[in-house]
A protein has these predicted regions:
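Short, Lys/Arg-enriched N-terminal segment that forms or immediately precedes the first helix
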Residues: 4-19
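Long, charge-rich, low-complexity alpha-helical segments
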Residues: 25-76
Length: 76
């Protein structure tokens, strides 16, 4: 999955937070919805401007961030 086709960061949109291309829906919002127990179907039904590929791109983006060691350390 090439997340760059779906995720952008534009300083004019949500102060540059990563968003789904063509929307003001942030990567952070999608992750928050999933962590709150929402299913992909619920997200797609609630936000019809995004696609399943866009949702998968959020996770591909997150994976690349983690691989680049772009994360917060967690103490044991």
């Amino acid at each position: 999955m090439n997340w760059q086709e779906h995720i952008i960061s534009d300083p004019k949109i949500l102060i540059g937070k990563p968003t789904i291309k063509g929307t003001r829906i942030s990567v952070e919002l999608i992750l928050d919805l999933f962590s709150s127990g929402w299913s992909e179907k619920q997200i797609l039904d609630s936000y019809p401007s995004i696609t399943s590929d866009s949702v998968r791109a959020v996770f591909a983006y997150l994976k690349d961030c983690i691989q680049q060691e772009f994360y917060f350390p967690i103490s044991a």
